């Protein structure tokens, strides 16, 4: 039973590259502290699981499930999130680079604007910590749905997380305080539509190996 | 419009009567049937250095006030549905009542179980409560470290409470997700807000420091009153 140790994936851009939508300070804390903590706790849970498996300790194995779900989910969600963001004004932020996804969005919600509105309403309706996702149901090129997951619950296979938005307060609070609507409005300026198109058309085989 | 009305009515109410709820939050006030944001009994900066003035101000004026406003909006919809005998809508509104009503209750209780050091914040409990803590946890310090562990273990947003079991009279530590309020079998004695907005501007990801600093501004006199 080998247990692979997970490490913090580097960001595909500089900490200040998402400004003014997300500040450098938020990105540094979010990546270096919050994401790192999920990874540390995931590694600890995996190592405890390996020992419990070796000794066939079923009660311990069961009691570890929630830690795995929370910290593994935290690692997966943040890994997906960093990659589905891009600095504002880059070509990747242009929805024209996501033709198949755009067509599917328009056929599902009537227009890109209607989708943006529906997605925002879903995000702002979250009660507590969680994530908002555009999900392709059942696999690549599936029916699109707006889904929220609580705390660090991930989007489970076979559903495909096309892109996700972190709605934990630590994702925006230092900059937006209680104005989470301002954060939700700004997020569209940094969505990586090219990455979203790739996930929608080809699926996500392993969110930790994007 | 409704917010304006209740606001001015609240000013008028302040000098007069204030309603007391059965949940034990002495500061729950209503004006013309609407919940209103209770005043704090101390200044925003009075809990420093445990909790910064900026945090207290945003937390009270913005976060708590949003729960109050949203609760009142929910209540209006609920009353409309009741008047029409619309059962489906009444049921659909339950999560909103729980979340916004819970947020209002929790924060009201929280402000009251905090106090500046100059007003007795951090002074250990005495009497029956002190005895109950010692006999349940061994010592106040033991209780505090168990409470801090419970707070640190919350996955997501939520609260940790010292509660009294109404059936047995025993005290215990319980955590609640999001704004779920302490109702039913348990009575809230002491609540600590573990939402990130309660500490992030000052402590960022170092939430353990917030949990350890808050004991300096706990109003044990309020907790004793709730216990007895």
From Swiss-Prot, chain A:
Subcellular location: Mitochondrion matrix
Keywords: Antioxidant, Manganese, Metal-binding, Mitochondrion, Oxidoreductase, Transit peptide
The reaction(s) this protein catalyses: 2 superoxide + 2 H(+) = H2O2 + O2
PROSITE patterns cross-referenced by the UniProt entry: SOD_MN (PS00088)
Residues at which Mn(2+) binds: 30, 78, 166, 170
Subunit and interaction comment: Homotetramer.
Protein name per UniProt: Superoxide dismutase [Mn], mitochondrial
Family: Belongs to the iron/manganese superoxide dismutase family.
Pfam families assigned: Sod_Fe_C, Sod_Fe_N
Enzyme Commission designation: 1.15.1.1
GO molecular function, one term: manganese ion binding
SUPFAM superfamilies in the record: Fe,Mn superoxide dismutase (SOD), C-terminal domain, Fe,Mn superoxide dismutase (SOD), N-terminal domain
Functional note: Destroys superoxide anion radicals which are normally produced within the cells and which are toxic to biological systems.
Cofactor dependency: Mn(2+)
Reported modifications of this chain: The N-terminus is blocked.
The record's free-text note on cofactor binding: Binds 1 Mn(2+) ion per subunit.
Domain of life (superkingdom): Eukaryota
Cellular-component GO terms for this entry: mitochondrial matrix
